[in-house]
């Protein structure tokens, strides 16, 4: 049975990020037709390493989904073995939808909790640490992606999974070094993109900012610099979403 509140949310803008299958067989209207393939590929790429990290934790394993949107991956984390999952997102509408869908599926609200919060406001001293931290589709919408990764590192006691759109700037960039006619070659680089207000760009995590988009070298470098060890780039199997197979989007994991 689909509640009246959920039906109203399904009929209201903006369109949804995740293709939840509801009890009556219906699905929300999506922002883009490719999204189901994107999410399926993401889940396939991370499931095994996430399960391993949850199994390796002491006591009841916990996870946090930073930039959780409507809570699809928060629910996956629970199905993969997390005893408690906390989802945070900067948008009220996303958290409202996440709670409605959680309740629709009959999930204990104490097992999957949701909170409206900015990633930069999170503090391990108050929230604690987690066996698994997800940052899926987030950092390339931020003005301070490295600061966000530092916070993610502080929250991680096991594994952190970061997924991002990346640039195709794989050749080194030439930069001056402060001396006339002297230069250095830098493998890591970030592209700047203006994100319009959220009302006009519903996929963006936060509108009205200059977002920084890394190339793969910059993403790996940032993970290492903020303190993750054994940083690994996960590869997508052939036959799955081409953005991942072709390297337009990458998934990187690091350990505490």
What are these regions (language model features)?
Residues 1-29:
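N-terminal, positively charged/glycine-rich alpha-helical extensions of SAM-dependent methyltransferases
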Residues 37-59:
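Conserved alpha-helix/loop element of class I SAM-dependent methyltransferases that forms part
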Residues 60-69:
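Conserved class I S-adenosyl-L-methionine
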Residues 71-75:
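Glycine-rich SAM-binding Motif I of class I
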Residues 76-116:
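Class I SAM-dependent methyltransferase SAM/SAH-binding core
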Residues 120, 134-135, 143-255:
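S-adenosyl-L-methionine-dependent methyltransferase catalytic module, highlighting the catalytic core
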Residues 124-132:
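A short acidic, Gly/Pro-enriched loop at the edge of an enzyme's catalytic core
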Residues 138:
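Hydrophobic adenine-recognition pocket in adenosine-nucleotide-binding enzymes
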